[in-house]
């Protein structure tokens, strides 16, 4: 399993989610969306094409497992860090 966390430096929820992932011993790669704007906008555009109501905010996680990947986005898929962690565990 591979977890990628799309984040922003000053995002309090992003910081809290990083801490929670560490507490759970889940390794992850961080991508700062302001450094990788083109990549982030491409992902957001792709998700909007799949679901026009799919607005994605940070933090967003990409969980890849057994050849499939799913995006878990704040405001769309979870409202709290605890909910985000529950969603991640569904794909373990």
Language-model segments: which ranges?
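Generic alpha-helical hydrophobic packing signal
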Residues: 26, 59-61, 71
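Short alpha-helical
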Residues: 12, 38, 79
């Amino acid at each position: 399993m591979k977890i990628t966390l799309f984040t922003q430096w000053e995002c309090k929820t992003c910081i809290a989610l990083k801490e929670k992932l560490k507490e759970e011993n889940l390794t992850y790669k961080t991508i700062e969306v302001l450094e990788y704007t083109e990549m982030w906008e491409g992902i957001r555009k792709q998700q909007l094409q799949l679901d026009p109501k799919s607005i994605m905010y940070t933090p967003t996680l990409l969980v890849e497992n057994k050849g499939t990947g799913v995006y878990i986005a704040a405001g769309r898929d979870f409202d709290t860090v605890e909910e985000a962690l529950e969603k991640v565990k569904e794909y373990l």
